[in-house]
A protein has these predicted regions:
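Detector for methionine-enriched segments
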Residues: 1-2, 218
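Generic start-of-chain signal for non-secretory N-termini
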Residues: 3-5, 23-33
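Bacterial N-terminal signal peptides that target proteins for export
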Residues: 2-15
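Surface-exposed extracytoplasmic segments
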Residues: 28-251
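Bacterial N-terminal signal peptides
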Residues: 13-23
């Protein structure tokens, strides 16, 4: 049994099925950002959800879901960085397609194997056994399974990729920690910044640095027919998406 939510990721809520990313604000976005929100994920960054993205695929009628995790500062030349294995960690993307802020569908992603030889398995989209902070493995037939760093596909049009990818987020992170030093990490070069505020605003355009450029996050990317996400494919409406990681009981 997998239990105990360690971190809820970004909520990309009230998304119009098949709509444009630029149009999300017109349907009422719920904004959230809570990196490093507990000492546990600060010391075990693999459990930290970086970002969740949802956008239309290049092919009409399809949607892309992205869950970024494993610390936002994974050096690009760190091929041995791994996902948590099935006996340790459960990665999930959850979908609410009825508007009650409770998951109606889940994608459960698990990993096996050691660094350089990991395999990924996806179950979903499927109705969850439980909802809320307690999570159990759905079991049943695998949707897709195979090695990481490979685009995998299923007969019903679900595609999966899991592996390191250039972090798509843009932020002058060094300056941010000069403004809010109590949020700086406890390890790495940014941990050496002063512990008291030394700035009150971000640097001006042209001076700001995209600090995460050249760093990876560990990405789980799913592309599938939008009809598999909505309650009624004939009237798709809106659906909300969020990501979580859970740790097995006793770990």
């Amino acid at each position: 049994m997998m239990q105990r939510i360690l971190k809820h990721g970004r909520l990309a809520s009230a998304i119009v099925a098949g709509g444009l990313v630029a149009g999300l604000a017109t349907v009422g976005r719920l904004k959230a950002s809570d990196h490093q929100d507990t000492p546990e994920v600060e010391l075990s960054p693999r459990y930290d959800v970086n970002d969740v993205y949802v956008f239309p695929a290049a092919t009409p009628g399809r949607t892309v879901l992205v869950l970024g995790t494993s610390s936002p500062l994974t050096p690009a030349k760190t091929p041995s960085f791994t996902f948590g294995t099935k006996d340790q960690e459960l990665y999930q993307i959850k979908v609410d397609n009825t508007g009650d802020a409770v998951e109606d569908l889940v994608f459960q992603i698990t990993f096996t194997g050691a660094a350089g030889h990991q395999r990924v398995t996806l179950h979903g989209p499927v109705k969850p056994n439980t909802t809320g902070p307690t999570n159990t493995l759905v079991g049943g037939k695998k949707t897709v399974s195979g090695p990481v760093n490979t685009v995998l596909g299923s007969s019903d049009g679900v595609q999966l990729f899991a592996g390191p990818r250039d972090d798509p987020f843009f932020i002058d992170l060094e300056q941010f920690f000069r403004i809010v030093p109590d949020r700086k990490p406890v390890t790495g070069p940014l941990s050496q910044l002063p512990s008291t505020p030394t700035a009150t605003s971000f640097r001006a355009a042209g001076q700001a640095l995209d600090y995460v450029r050249g760093f990876n996050d560990m990405a789980i990317v799913i592309e599938l027919p939008t009809s598999l996400l909505v309650a009624n494919p004939q009237h798709p409406g809106r659906f909300g998406v969020w990501g979580t990681t859970s740790r097995a009981r006793g770990i």
